[in-house]
Amino acid sequence: MNSRTTPSLCIAALAVLLAATVPVAGQDGRAGGAAPGAAQGGRGRGAAPEPAGPIPRRPDGHPDLTGTFSGGLQLSHTVILEAHPGGFGVTAGKGLIIDPPDGVIPYQPWALAERDRRRDDSNGYEDPVGHCEFYDIGRVHSFGQTYQFDGDDYFIIHGNQHQTRVVDMKRKTHLPEGIRLWLGDPIGHWEGDTMVVDSTNFNGRPRMAIGGDFYGPDAHIVERWTMKDSNTLNWTMTIENPKVFTRAWTMTSALPMTRAQNARENYDDEDTCHEGNVDLAHLKNLYYQVHPEKAPKAQ
């Protein structure tokens, strides 16, 4: 988020966030109940994609994942991971978690308390994104657009907010323990037609959503990128960290990512943030609306 973020969008995000804490029962469907194939591009511009065909392949036989793919926008600024009652244009549903089946992140008791502390509206402006810092991996690729450039030795993933990861397809071991990165250290390999990205060495600072979810610096994250046809890319992410969670859990993109045509121009755009950034002001204003007694007194 940056200067394009509007007050109404922030208010909607906060309202859905607060509503997401209400238990929901008897819900079916994933990713906010959106219909399959109803993907809406993050910034998608350009013509509709050509009809789907066979999976494109590289000379070595692996799928060619090069291109621009758009996920669903419905959950883009809330990234609702768990079951939620809906509101503000977001349909009630199970969120993005597909395992465990109940759609609830399996936090350790202390970690759940920390998540709730971060979720409290008084801590809303602690979100690093409001400071023009990085999203986490899931927040980058579960919505919006993903630009991918396939190669023999390296695979470049360019996600939302111009956050780029270079996946080393040859290296077998991760960086030394002391090197900690915002998006971790990604190394990749192929399992049949699925590209697997294995990441460790996180610095623990990004949040998974505006709701304060986190996975900690010692997380081990495995992503799977699988093409269904020439226009459709499925993505899942499995997270494990025994210090934070009671078991591993898996989320997926809001909708299957579909190929966007003529969208390379988005990669070339300069995505400014510090210049004219208004996120912190919006987040603080939301807090003061909820707690007017804590608002600064007029001089």
What are these regions (language model features)?
Residues 14, 20-299:
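PEST-like low-complexity, intrinsically disordered acidic/proline/serine-rich tracts
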Residues 1-12:
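Bacterial N-terminal signal peptides that target proteins for export
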